[in-house]
Regions:
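ATP/NTP phosphate-donor binding region
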Residues: 2, 6-57, 291, 298, ...
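Glycine-rich beta-strand-to-loop/alpha-helix junction loops that act as flexible
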Residues: 7, 61-63, 84-86
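ATP/nucleoside-binding phosphotransfer catalytic cores, i.e., glycine-rich phosphate-binding loops
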Residues: 14, 174, 205, 215-340
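Catalytic core of DAGKc-family lipid kinases
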Residues: 28, 76-80, 86-188
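Short glycine/serine/threonine-rich phosphate/pyrophosphate-binding segments
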Residues: 43, 65-70, 91
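Glycine-rich phosphate/pyrophosphate-binding beta-alpha loops
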Residues: 132, 187-200, 266
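A generic structural signal for short beta-strands and their flanking turns/coil linkers
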Residues: 166-168, 182-184, 207-212, 246-250
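Active-site loop ensemble at the mouth of alpha/beta enzyme cores that anchors a bound cofactor
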Residues: 200-208
Length: 340
């Protein structure tokens, strides 16, 4: 058995992870080869080369973007994907119940099982977690321009941009039916979440051969707390502003070209966006004792609490900033009046 490690920028120290990997990897099962990515798209090329060489597994050290680059070269091959998550969201790893701690993730590489999962395509670009149009795609574009990474940066961009983003009207064609929606966003889930346990498609599974589509209709500021709460509570599909359905293929028609996202990465596409599911296309190393499409209750509870705290802190900070601006403006106006 052979293993290739891909390395790319992320939120944790890769050198430390590589040290742990050298210490903990089962040398009797794996011959270790470490290759550093040098540019965007480099992982696609090298993973394809390793798949042609019939490597047993290619291990992604990074987040969903890195995983996407590697996995797209491994679909419909005998080479499995392994994940040591250290990105800003880690949506696919979380869905697969791969531990966020690198040492424990390495244990999964040594002792895990190989499962076969679905993946999706958006205008023939592969995705493994989620894709979509609308606000989440717009935020992914802003996030890609940010100097800082991580969940707080994403949350900050989400809160700031939500104040000025305007919903669009979309025509949806799915499995023979056509619908028209005015929507804030349309998300297509192969997996259940964006990352950081933000469940945009809470009922999605990786092996049912279906896309889980979530439509968020226009909402008011009064809806934000409940939407945020339910996003992390895995119940957003119960909100009255949400429409959901399942399909194998979906065409999204919009009035003009714009940004889409796939696994959190933005890309410009035209008026027509075609999304489809590809059944059982990728082999993945998963925990041996993982329950199908459930997660550790205590871990989910802690992640949920952390998510709510981040949202609350961000709202408080945003409100405090706005109040300060109003107060400063009031002081300036008062000074002008007193000088008259």
């Amino acid at each position: 058995r052979q293993m290739c490690i891909r390395d790319r920028s992320g939120t944790q120290s890769k050198e430390q992870i590589l040290k742990w990997l050298d210490e903990k990897l089962d040398k009797e099962r794996y011959a270790q080869e470490v290759i550093y990515t040098e540019r965007a798209g480099h992982a696609v090329e090298i993973a394809a080369q390793k798949a042609q060489e019939d490597a047993h597994a290619v291990i992604a050290i990074g987040g969903d973007g890195t995983i996407n680059e590697i996995a797209r070269s491994l679909v419909h091959t005998k080479t499995a994907l392994g994940i040591i998550p250290c990105g800003s969201g880690n949506g696919l790893a979380r869905h697969l119940q791969i531990p966020m701690e690198p040492k424990k993730a390495i244990d999964i590489i040594n002792d895990g099982l190989i499962d076969i999962i679905d993946y999706g395509k958006i205008n023939d670009v592969p995705f493994f977690c989620t894709c979509g149009v609308g606000f989440d795609a717009f935020v992914s574009l802003q996030f890609s321009k940010a100097g800082r990474r991580g969940p707080l940066t994403y949350l900050e961009k989400t809160l700031l941009e939500s104040l000025k983003y305007r919903p669009e009207t979309y025509e949806l064609e799915m499995d023979g039916s056509t619908l028209r929606y005015k929507a804030f966003l349309i998300a297509c889930g192969n997996a259940s979440q964006y990352g950081n346990n933000a469940y945009i498609a809470p009922q999605a599974t990786l092996n049912d051969g279906l896309l889980d589509v979530t439509i968020l209709e226009p909402f008011t500021v009064l809806d934000v707390p409940s939407l945020s709460f339910q996003l992390f509570n895995k119940t957003i599909d119960q909100n009255s502003r949400i429409k959901t359905f399942r399909c194998q293929t979906l065409r999204i028609h919009r009035s003009k070209p714009g940004v889409v996202h796939f696994d959190g990465d933005p890309m410009m596409m035209g008026e027509n966006v075609d999304v489809k599911i590809m059944k059982k296309g990728l082999q993945v190393i998963v925990p041996r004792d993982a329950e199908k499409d459930t997660s550790n209750v205590l871990q989910r509870a802690q992640d949920y609490i952390n998510g709510l705290k981040q949202i609350n802190d961000a709202f408080v900070e945003d409100i405090a900033h706005k109040n300060k601006m109003i107060l400063d403006k009031g002081k300036r106006q008062f000074k002008k009046l007193t000088k008259m």
